Amino acid sequence: MAIRDWPEGEGPREKLLQRGAAHLSDAELLAVLLRNGVSGQNAVDLARELIGEFGGLRPLFSATKQQVCRLQGLGPVKYAQLQASAELARRLAGESLQRGAVLTSPDLTRDYLRFQLADRAYEVFAVLLLDSQHRVIQFVELFRGTIDAASVYPRELVSLVLEKRAAAVIVCHNHPSGVAEPSQADRRITERLKNALATIDVSLLDHMVVGDREIVSFAERGWIG
């Protein structure tokens, strides 16, 4: 049944306007973003199918274009709508660590990195640049793709740190497998970066590896030293 044929006030947009977004289900909120359905499905039914197909909102919003567009009736426009919404949500979360914000606890950093990096279908290597008071200067994605000792160039990090005049950094990356346990390659990369930063008197405070349910801190394991 088309949403326009539903009882008055039961459509997701009308319900949102009358009762507030908190009263909508995940599928109803997603339907508002999608705006319309596809042949044979209204927007709410389509939203339910998408959430079920991908196993939740996080994997859906981090899915690739190919993964989304392989579903019948979906194309680049729907994918663009999902990506725009996900990026807005990331930027909103990022406001908690805007320039000048102080990292008061590891949990704050974990929450931010979890939202930025968890459930991505590809690896992202990034850095949090901090001043001498551990206030945030900037969060920068250095590159995307398979991360190994050959693909991480210490000179690029050093150049960025000098450009932004950072006094300390936290590096981080995700494991698309969902398992956060660091590899030996991760430990070797960390040692190389720490040594490179030491040549310009900048501290590597931590390397955090983001998985689906856990974020491993090198500092907490005593691996930074």
Swiss-Prot record:
<keyword id="KW-0479">Metal-binding</keyword>
<feature type="domain" description="MPN">
    <location>
        <begin position="102"/>
        <end position="224"/>
    </location>
</feature>
<dbReference type="InterPro" id="IPR046778">
    <property type="entry name" value="UPF0758_N"/>
</dbReference>
<keyword id="KW-0482">Metalloprotease</keyword>
<feature type="binding site">
    <location>
        <position position="175"/>
    </location>
    <ligand>
        <name>Zn(2+)</name>
    </ligand>
</feature>
<feature type="binding site">
    <location>
        <position position="173"/>
    </location>
    <ligand>
        <name>Zn(2+)</name>
    </ligand>
</feature>
<dbReference type="InterPro" id="IPR037518">
    <property type="entry name" value="MPN"/>
</dbReference>
<dbReference type="GO" id="GO:0006508">
    <property type="term" value="P:proteolysis"/>
</dbReference>
<dbReference type="InterPro" id="IPR010994">
    <property type="entry name" value="RuvA_2-like"/>
</dbReference>
<dbReference type="GO" id="GO:0008237">
    <property type="term" value="F:metallopeptidase activity"/>
</dbReference>
<dbReference type="GO" id="GO:0046872">
    <property type="term" value="F:metal ion binding"/>
</dbReference>
<feature type="short sequence motif" description="JAMM motif">
    <location>
        <begin position="173"/>
        <end position="186"/>
    </location>
</feature>
<protein>
    <recommendedName>
        <fullName>UPF0758 protein Sama_0327</fullName>
    </recommendedName>
</protein>
<comment type="similarity">
    <text>Belongs to the UPF0758 family.</text>
</comment>
<dbReference type="InterPro" id="IPR020891">
    <property type="entry name" value="UPF0758_CS"/>
</dbReference>
<keyword id="KW-0378">Hydrolase</keyword>
<feature type="binding site">
    <location>
        <position position="186"/>
    </location>
    <ligand>
        <name>Zn(2+)</name>
    </ligand>
</feature>
<dbReference type="InterPro" id="IPR025657">
    <property type="entry name" value="RadC_JAB"/>
</dbReference>
<dbReference type="InterPro" id="IPR001405">
    <property type="entry name" value="UPF0758"/>
</dbReference>
<dbReference type="Pfam" id="PF04002">
    <property type="entry name" value="RadC"/>
</dbReference>
<dbReference type="Pfam" id="PF20582">
    <property type="entry name" value="UPF0758_N"/>
</dbReference>
<keyword id="KW-0645">Protease</keyword>
<keyword id="KW-0862">Zinc</keyword>
